[in-house]
């Protein structure tokens, strides 16, 4: 039997939150590329903890966003999109996604309602059949699809996998997200919180800074720069005047890619630096002096050290 939740159908937890036993747990978000996982994590956490772009496979490793809702601390694990891997980096990303799912208390499968169960979604459903954790289905972008089609999509997915609950949401405008959070509070086990109350991510600030610059790189260059690029924070210096000096390197594989990253007269790298510096200053609440360098490192995608920098295991063979 399929249990579907939409807006305002979930009873609220009554009583004072601080009088209730605390709950905590890990929720892994999995799904095809560009299903909206990072957008949803940022929405549920209430702050930006995972980068977002229109490009597929933006998330490369598991990112954790930490939300407090009522008496529960919910740790969301934003995993890379699951797709058919072609390169070594692809294999590492997909392995990371399934590894995140296996480590979680609950698995949330996010499906783009417009794309439905085509392609990678079918393969993910097959892979979920033998996963023992409790599973919920979230149909995203419901404002773009007729309700009749949403119900058909939910039924088709539930025929393949026994989901404990199905939610219809919009990660962009927040529709259905409150009901989702209420359900997670009720479902996660009782126990102490894993992180301090004011912590929203477990990502080191140096790595978060690199992720933000990588996002600006994607947003600025669109389809011009292939995925053979990687950003590392090489220097982080707190200065006496209260500012911070950050030096980052954008690694590419060929000179032609370096020219794209720099842009004509350096216009591209200047725009990327300005956008990244602005966001970093807002996050850190202090002035930021950001210096970006572009270096060619052939076949960096075969370098185990680069994988460790991204938080990925290096696949052998």
From Swiss-Prot:
Membrane topology label: Peripheral membrane protein
G4: annotated span: 140-143
SUPFAM superfamilies referenced in this protein's UniProt entry, alphabetically: P-loop containing nucleoside triphosphate hydrolases (SSF52540), Prokaryotic type KH domain (KH-domain type II) (SSF54814)
Major location (coarse): cytoplasm
Signal peptide: none
Stored InterPro entries: G_ERA_dom (IPR030388), GTP-bd (IPR006073), GTPase_Era-like (IPR005662), KH_dom-like_a/b (IPR015946), KH_dom_type_2 (IPR004044), KH_sf_prok-type (IPR009019), P-loop_NTPase (IPR027417), Small_GTP-bd (IPR005225)
Entry binding sites for GTP: 31-38, 78-82, 140-143
Subcellular location(s) per record: Cytoplasm; Cell inner membrane
GO annotation, biological process: ribosomal small subunit assembly
CDD domains according to UniProt: Era, KH-II_Era
Sequence segments annotated as region (G3): 78-81
Region (G5): 169-171
Domain annotation KH type-2: ranges: 221-298
Record-level GO cellular component terms: cytosol; plasma membrane
GO MF annotations, alphabetized: GTP binding; GTPase activity; ribosomal small subunit binding; small ribosomal subunit rRNA binding
Pfam families per UniProt: KH_2, MMR_HSR1
UniProt keyword annotations, A-Z: Cell inner membrane, Cell membrane, Cytoplasm, GTP-binding, Membrane, Nucleotide-binding, Ribosome biogenesis, RNA-binding, rRNA-binding
Region of interest called G1, as start-end residue ranges on this chain: 31-38
Domain Era-type G: 23-190
Span list, region G2: 57-61
Purpose: An essential GTPase that binds both GDP and GTP, with rapid nucleotide exchange. Plays a role in 16S rRNA processing and 30S ribosomal subunit biogenesis and possibly also in cell cycle regulation and energy metabolism.
Family: Belongs to the TRAFAC class TrmE-Era-EngA-EngB-Septin-like GTPase superfamily. Era GTPase family.
Name of protein: GTPase Era
Organism of provenance: Agrobacterium fabrum (strain C58 / ATCC 33970)
Lineage: Bacteria, Pseudomonadati, Pseudomonadota, Alphaproteobacteria, Hyphomicrobiales
């Amino acid at each position: 039997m399929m249990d579907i939740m939409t807006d305002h159908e979930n009873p609220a937890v009554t009583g004072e939150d601080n009088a209730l036993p605390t709950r905590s747990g890990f929720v892994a978000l999995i799904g095809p590329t560009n299903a909206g996982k990072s957008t949803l994590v940022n929405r549920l956490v209430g702050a930006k903890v995972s980068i977002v772009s229109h490009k597929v496979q933006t998330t490369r490793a598991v990112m954790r966003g930490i939300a407090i809702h009522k008496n529960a601390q919910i740790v969301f694990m934003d995993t890379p999109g699951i797709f058919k891997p072609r390169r070594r980096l692809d294999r590492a990303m997909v392995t990371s996604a399934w590894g995140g799912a296996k480590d979680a208390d609950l698995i949330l499968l996010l499906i783009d309602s417009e794309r439905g169960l085509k392609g990678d979604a079918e393969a993910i459903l097959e892979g979920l059949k033998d996963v023992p954790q409790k599973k919920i289905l979230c149909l995203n972008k419901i404002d773009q699809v007729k309700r009749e089609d949403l119900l058909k999509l939910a039924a088709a997915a539930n025929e393949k996998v026994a989901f404990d609950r199905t939610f219809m949401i919009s990660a962009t405008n927040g529709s259905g997200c409150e009901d989702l959070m209420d359900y997670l509070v009720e479902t996660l086990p009782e126990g102490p919180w894993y992180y301090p109350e004011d912590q929203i991510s477990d990502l080191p600030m140096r790595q978060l800074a690199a992720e933000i610059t990588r996002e600006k790189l994607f947003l600025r260059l669109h389809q011009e720069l292939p995925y053979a690029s990687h950003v590392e924070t090489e220097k982080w210096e707190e200065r006496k005047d209260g500012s911070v000096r950050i030096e980052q390197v954008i690694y590419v594989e060929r000179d032609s890619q370096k020219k794209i990253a720099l842009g004509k007269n350096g216009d591209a790298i200047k725009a990327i630096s300005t956008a990244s510096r602005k966001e970093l200053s807002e996050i850190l609440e202090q002035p930021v002096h950001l210096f970006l360098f572009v270096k060619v490192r052939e076949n960096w995608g075969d370098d185990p050290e680069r994988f460790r920098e991204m938080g990925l295991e290096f696949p052998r063979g």
